Amino acid sequence: MWLRPSIWLCFPLCLALPGQSQPKAADDLGGLYCGPSSFHFSINLLSQDTATPPALVVWDRRGRLHKLQNDSGCGTWVHKGPGSSMGVEASYRGCYVTEWDSHYLMPIGLEEADAGGHRTVTETKLFKCPVDFLALDVPTIGLCDAVPVWDRLPCAPPPITQGECKQLGCCYNSEEVPSCYYGNTVTSRCTQDGHFSIAVSRNVTSPPLLWDSVHLAFRNDSECKPVMETHTFVLFRFPFSSCGTAKRVTGNQAVYENELVAARDVRTWSHGSITRDSIFRLRVSCIYSVSSSALPVNIQVFTLPPPLPETHPGPLTLELQIAKDERYGSYYNASDYPVVKLLREPIYVEVSIRHRTDPSLGLHLHQCWATPGMSPLLQPQWPMLVNGCPYTGDNYQTKLIPVQKASNLLFPSHYQRFSVSTFSFVDSVAKQALKGPVYLHCTASVCKPAGAPICVTTCPAARRRRSSDIHFQNGTASISSKGPMILLQATRDSSERLHKYSRPPVDSHALWVAGLLGSLIIGALLVSYLVFRKWR
């Protein structure tokens, strides 16, 4: 029998254009700092395989590849850092930044030459910063000047402008190091990755605090202790999910709260007690909209154990995931998207039944296709699976991956896997690759028993072209993903070579006319020559 509850699945990716090598996530592309108006990050360019450092590349909004260099017109500034590293600042309004889902996105890559001298992208990383950046109150001049140079606690890594430093609620002096530092007050921030950041000066009270006694009120274990200290400052940084942080939801707002307190030196004798220290108790709150899609919070959902198998119809949850490699050992999380890929690089897709332990259930895929937007009905479309089988009209056919061989799965019949080579949509008139997002969609149903013929798809061996019309069968439902693909170009010189060596197409009719005219001219000359000889 068929269990009618099913799901229509899709998932986002980021693509790049053709290249031979597959990019890998670059661990040394890091050090990101999200400023109020620009990205700040550092990159280590030293290659482990060659003494020649690779080139730093970036993609524009149309997916074309460029060398990353100083270009004020495009809002990029590059400077040499310590050792082989480079520091980069990129304006959110520049040529290489795209806005999506309340975030600024900037794909960065490292380009190296192979043994034949062909340059290709070998590493990629996508930097993300939130669009909404709330400025904090700037400390007064007295609170800044009163901090000795040797006792200043850095507020942000260099390079940073005065405007960006003030947006963080910190002090700025370009002639000193650090140039951006905390003032003699309390500076608290709610970071985009879901952390409290609280800097406290001992001079925030009079008399000064016992600075080494400042601690979180509800937890004081190792992860909740200060991450940095000077003789004047302590800096706390901890996630919303730890250190006794309280959460409450009021209307459309989620509020995260914690408290800092400072101990006092109390002197006691038989007739009473005294103290000469200030009372300090600080409550810090971070407030976010529950309906926002750009919460800077890493959310973990802990579900109850699945119920025992039932034989009657009931609600089912299906999930589509993208694996990081062909082993399906790990998957991209929601925070990893958009995912950067090169064209023709395989994407490993998995659709599964969730939270069920009935081994007799089977998952059946119907259609899988791609669209350039979130709507599964959007045109143009490109099929990947048709009636559960690879679409034969594609020269890079989708590959079905048997799940039964996966020994680490308790219920293999709950899973379906396939791989597809990444691609970009092409304008049917201009014959150029379309920029913008690309989405994957699938329709699926759950059947029982899993081994029944109705649950098994048999694909024809012949390379007969199957109908690519996308239609929805009874007993299937739908759901759409919320992330895009980004189209990127893999080599800088491919478009230049195409333009250099391409020529306008030759009209065959024009060639025929030219040949006929040539024949007539030659014939006329020959007749004239014979007449001339006869006359003489």
From Swiss-Prot:
One GO term of the biological process aspect: acrosomal vesicle exocytosis
Maturation-removed propeptide residues: 463-536
Superkingdom, taxonomy of origin: Eukaryota
Disulfide bonds: C368-C442
Principal subcellular localization: membrane
Membrane-spanning ranges: 512-532
Pfam families: Trefoil, Zona_pellucida, ZP-N, ZP1_ZP4_Ig-like
Glycosylated sites: N70, N203, N220, S293, T303, N333, N474
Record's comment describing the protein's domains: The ZP domain is involved in the polymerization of the ZP proteins to form the zona pellucida.
Family assignment from sequence similarity: Belongs to the ZP domain family. ZPB subfamily.
Protein name: Zona pellucida sperm-binding protein 4
Organism encoding this protein: Sus scrofa
